Every structure is written in structure tokens, then in C-alpha cells.
């Protein structure tokens, strides 16, 4: 009799788990083609995914200024689980009952980040005033509409009270693991939205810096010009023989110049240009200022 009752209890628990799994799968399917704004408009989705609805509505404050304008988007999808078949054949021990049973399914949630490749505005009041676009023919490129960079993806494992990184295509030099440890663990599962927000801004800042570097490179046509940068485009070096030697350091979370060291060649000597350095620091128009300065006739008259 005890064995029959034990079996009945085990069957009931398995049924409850299977029902819970089906509910989670249905919820993930409903997220297909959704956007982050949809989560705000559908509190039942955020609640079932253990995301606090009030936190979703809250606009993050006290964040560093992001000196760029971009059109970007975050969308959700349900990816296929490559481990689904292996899980069906995997047996595990139930910690509560001690029974051996099939490994439970852990749902996946996919997030796609789409970032504009070209800036709508990167320090210029309008495109017609942009000396970079005029010098590089970028106005013609923008006439046909803007383009997107390759999309970036993050696949999450969805647990009862938290999320976990499973796979992602974010470049390794953009470290998101620290944010994942802070915002996705069981202690702070309601902060899923802020994690996505921070990753989106990190990617947008990186693409903006990369594009700014490309624009500067296209604009400077002086013979002997050498422009280099690290992978994250936060450390930029510009060298023009007998004209300028400049080292610029940008914030990893924006396009702001946070440190600079610039030497100008004058009277057969290299002299540090403190005025130009100060004009670039924390100035969203620093690309404009730098290119205008370097393309001015007096800047390379010594050549």
C-alpha cells in the first residue's frame, strides 16, 4: 500500500513539473518577435519571467552620459535547444524524492541586438555641417538610408528565479560576465531589464567608436598618416609626420574622450597642445573638432 501511495505521489509531482514546463514553453513562444517595450506593456510576461514589472517601467537614472544618437532595437526569440535530445536520455536523481527520473528541461530565451552602423548624429547639428561626411562622401552613402551592423545575440537559460548566460556573440573584449553575475543571479533576478539595457548601450558605444575611427581615417588624406586603435576602439593613436602625434582614450561605455595627449610639430620641435586636449575632453563634438583642426591648411603647412 505504501509503495502504491509513493508511486502516486511521484506521478503527481512529475505531472506538476511537466505542466510547469509547458507553461514556460508557451510563455517563451509568446515572446517571439517581441520587443523590450512589449515586456513593459505586458506585465504578465515580466511577472512570469520573474522580472519585476515596476522595475521594468523605471527608467535607469544616474547613468553616464552617452554622447551619441543611434537607432537600436532589442528583440526576443525562442531558440532551438541543442541539448534537448540528450536531456531526454539523461537520468538524474530527484533531490526531494530520491527517485531516478529524466532530467528536467531548462527553457532558453534568445535576445537579439540590432545597432545602426552609421550615426544619425555624432556631434554635428546636421549632416550638411559634417566635415567628415563631406570629405569622405558619406552624405552619398546616407542618402540610400542607414544600415545596420551585424546583429549580436545572447542566449539565456531561464530558471525559476534567475537567468544564466548560455551562448552569446558579444565580442570577448566587451566583458559582460561581470554584469551577468550582478544582475542575472538568483539574488537579483528582477534586474534582467537593466542588464539588457547596459549591454545594448555597450554595443552601441563600441560601434559608434568604431565608426568614428573609420570616419577619421577617411577624412585624413595627408601622406604618411598612421591611425591605429585597440580592438574595443577605446585607445586611438594618430601620427602624421611633422604635424601631430595624438593619443586619445575613450570611455568604454560611450564615445567620450576621457584622456588625451597631443603634440604638435612647430619650429622643428614637438610641443604639447594643451588647448586642443581640453577642447576634446568630454566633448560630444570631438570628432568634428579634431578633423577640422587636422585638415586646416595651417596644421600641415610644414609639410
From Swiss-Prot:
GO cellular component, one term: nucleus
Main location: nucleus
BP term (GO), one: mitotic sister chromatid segregation
Cysteine pairs bridged by disulfides in the record: none
Subcellular location(s) of the protein: Nucleus; Chromosome, Centromere, Kinetochore; Chromosome, Centromere
Residue ranges crossing the lipid bilayer per the database entry: none
Acyltransferase as UniProt keyword: no
Superkingdom per UniProt: Eukaryota
Database matches in InterPro entries: CENP-O
Keywords tagged on the record: Cell cycle, Cell division, Centromere, Chromosome, Kinetochore, Mitosis, Nucleus
Described function: Component of the kinetochore, a multiprotein complex that assembles on centromeric DNA and attaches chromosomes to spindle microtubules, mediating chromosome segregation and sister chromatid segregation during meiosis and mitosis. Component of the inner kinetochore COMA complex, which connects centromere-associated proteins and the outer kinetochore. COMA interacts with other inner kinetochore proteins to form the inner kinetochore constitutive centromere-associated network (CCAN), which serves as a structural platform for outer kinetochore assembly.
Family: Belongs to the CENP-O/MCM21 family.
The protein's assembly and partners: Component of the heterotetrameric kinetochore subcomplex COMA, which consists of fta2, fta7, mal2 and mis17. The COMA subcomplex is part of a larger constitutive centromere-associated network (CCAN) (also known as central kinetochore Sim4 complex in fission yeast), which is composed of at least cnl2, cnp3, cnp20, fta1, fta2, fta3, fta4, fta6, fta7, mal2, mhf1, mhf2, mis6, mis15, mis17, sim4 and wip1.
Name by which UniProt lists this protein: Inner kinetochore subunit mal2
Protein species of origin: Schizosaccharomyces pombe (strain 972 / ATCC 24843)
Gene that this sequence comes from: mal2
